[in-house]
């Protein structure tokens, strides 16, 4: 059976040693049986959007896992839509910096019976040229699908609860959702896996599992995520690809440290 290891929101930086212990514990947990694919769903770095050294270190640590790596950027890696990151919008320099260390930020990989599609959620609704390029890529990603099932990965969830919900900071906005429609509405879709929220949660819509990966780093104060379901325990996910569905297993080895962002604010994202 094919398997995909999903790593998300490690927020690594050479300016501190935060979260490295959690990443190392997951690496050890999978060292005896390498996954067929390692999918990093964004925010690999603490501030790669402005600091190349953060991206460089994050790339090194994520490449330390056994298996092929497909890395997708998060808002702290390349910036995002100005509504989410008003001082760090996606631009050519930020995209180029990511690509130097971690590749194109999207990809299609075929595994037996499955097509894995990874997308850059942070260019959606930005107006950047890369948004148009990716829209074409989305359509092309379905060519030659045959009887394969689809597993979609990206940093931000396609939506939190319903496909018609309004814009909010925790998911892709309606404009981006429109670009995703060819995949989200495809009858072969079985998994939409994301990060960003620092919560572990799974819901089903028909045959599709929508899974939020836990963060490898910190959790948010519950008061800042009112109404959002899920567990705050750090970890990673192992997706096992069956013939017509995905079995998702939480990896949370003993010793992983759960840290509230408020308690390390000065070492991560100091408030101005």
Over which residues does each language-model region extend?
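Extended active-site neighborhood of metal-dependent phosphoesterases/phosphodiesterases
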Residues: 50-145, 149, 174-185, 206, ...
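Generic enzyme active-site microenvironment
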Residues: 7, 41, 72, 153, ...
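A cross-domain feature marking catalytic cores of carbohydrate-active enzymes
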Residues: 42-44, 73-75, 121, 154-156, ...
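His/acidic metal-ligating clusters that form di-metal
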Residues: 28-38, 115-117, 127-211, 246, ...
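Active-site environment of divalent metal-dependent phosphoester hydrolases
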Residues: 13-16, 46-50, 75-83, 124-127, ...
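N-terminal active-site segment of His-dependent metallophosphoesterases
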Residues: 1-57, 61
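A short, polar/proline- and glycine-enriched secondary-structure boundary/capping micro-motif
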Residues: 17, 128-130, 222, 256-265
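A short C-terminal boundary segment appended to hydrolase-like catalytic domains
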Residues: 191, 235-272
């Amino acid at each position: 059976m094919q398997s995909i290891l999903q790593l998300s929101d490690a927020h690594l930086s050479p300016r501190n040693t935060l979260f490295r212990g959690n990443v190392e514990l997951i690496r050890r947990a999978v060292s005896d049986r390498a996954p067929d694919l390692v999918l990093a769903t964004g925010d690999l770095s603490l501030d790669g959007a402005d600091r190349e050294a953060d991206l460089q270190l994050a790339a090194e640590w994520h490449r330390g896992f056994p298996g092929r790596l497909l890395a997708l950027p998060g808002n702290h890696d390349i910036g995002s839509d100005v509504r989410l990151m008003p001082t760090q919008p996606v631009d050519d320099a930020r995209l180029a910096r990511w690509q130097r260390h971690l590749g194109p930020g999207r990809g299609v990989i075929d595994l037996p019976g499955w097509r894995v599609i990874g997308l850059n959620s942070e260019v959606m609704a930005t107006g950047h040229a890369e948004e148009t390029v990716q829209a074409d890529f989305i359509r092309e990603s379905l060519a030659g699908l045959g009887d394969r099932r689809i597993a979609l990965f990206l940093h931000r969830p396609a939506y939190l609860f319903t496909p018609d919900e309004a814009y909010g900071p925790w998911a892709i906005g309606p404009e981006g959702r429109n670009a995703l429609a060819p995949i989200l509405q495809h009858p072969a879709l079985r998994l939409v896996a994301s990060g960003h929220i620092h919560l572990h949660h799974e819901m089903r819509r028909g045959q599709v599992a929508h899974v939020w990966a836990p963060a490898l780093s910190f959790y948010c104060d519950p008061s800042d995520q009112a109404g959002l379901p899920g567990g705050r325990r750090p970890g990673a996910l192992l997706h096992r690809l069956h013939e017509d569905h995905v079995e998702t297993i939480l990896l949370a080895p003993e010793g992983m440290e759960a840290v509230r962002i408020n308690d390390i604010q000065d070492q991560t994202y100091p408030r101005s």
